């Protein structure tokens, strides 16, 4: 399963949308090197998932390919706010081709997956996050927007969205509130990297078997570009850099900087390593 968090970070007067997740797939075994965030082929948005991989991965690939098949979606003439409707239609359309159901079953099983579409809208000049989920009452996918926190001071701006198993999500929410209260930011200010710290600690503590592996992280900027950021995992001392959930091999590198999970204030160039001859 998953614990995924999307939030608007405000630092130095600049806003960026951060999407982060654990990297574990489970089901009789733990596989801790899997992408749960997919950069869509239009630079300003990503889609992430929580739930059953057999439902999620095909639909995320359908979303990716559908953008390639429709030029306005790829060149961003279709704004992010309309892209979510396109993806809803793609998901529903794809499920029409499920057949050979068990004897006596009339409709396919409900998909056990939830998605988060996160990105920057050139129309509204804002970051947005929507959860896409299957609504059994209408028999199709629908979406719900993430909203800003209420009861905040005038200078505060907190937009955050969680996807994942109920227990880890509830734990993450409680920890974030406690952390913000301890730092005097519960009603004032904006989110920085506090959600990252919460995700980091939950993974490290190993309290939830469905949540584990390296943190994967993507940043989306107001210039409408999304980039995957590396994370030293389990810590900087290990020297191991993970990108989109997978630890890099010796001869691989990343162009977009690396975060120290214990000092996540900024992404820095990776520590120098000796080049490795590749076959």
Regions found by a protein language model. Name each.
Residues 1-279:
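N-terminal nucleophile
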């Amino acid at each position: 399963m998953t614990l995924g968090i999307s939030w608007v970070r405000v630092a130095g007067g600049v806003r960026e949308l951060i999407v982060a997740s654990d990297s574990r797939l489970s089901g009789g075994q733990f596989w801790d090197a899997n992408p749960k965030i997919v950069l869509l082929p239009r630079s300003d948005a990503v889609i992430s998932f929580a739930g059953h991989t057999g439902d999620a991965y095909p639909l995320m690939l359908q979303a990716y390919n559908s953008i390639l098949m429709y030029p306005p979606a790829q060149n961003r003439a279709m704004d992010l706010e309309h892209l979510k409707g396109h993806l809803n239609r793609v998901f529903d359309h794809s499920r029409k081709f499920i057949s050979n159901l068990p004897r006596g079953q009339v409709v396919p099983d409900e998909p056990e997956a939830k998605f988060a579409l996160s990105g920057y809208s050139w129309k509204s000049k804002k970051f947005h996050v929507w959860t896409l989920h299957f609504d059994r009452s209408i028999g199709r996918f629908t979406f719900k927007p993430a909203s800003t926190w209420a009861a905040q001071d005038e200078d505060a701006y907190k937009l955050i969205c969680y996807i994942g198993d109920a227990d880890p999500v509830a734990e993450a929410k409680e920890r974030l509130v406690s952390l913000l209260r301890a730092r005097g930011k519960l009603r004032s200010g904006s989110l920085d990297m506090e959600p990252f710290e919460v995700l980091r600690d939950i993974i490290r503590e190993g309290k939830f078997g469905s949540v584990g592996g390296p943190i994967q992280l993507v940043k989306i900027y107001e210039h409408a570009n999304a980039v995957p950021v590396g994370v030293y995992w389990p810590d900087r001392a290990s020297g191991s850099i993970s990108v989109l959930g997978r630890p890099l091999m010796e001869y691989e590198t990343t162009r977009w900087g690396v975060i120290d999970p214990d000092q996540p204030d900024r992404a820095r160039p990776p520590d120098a390593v000796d080049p490795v001859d590749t076959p």
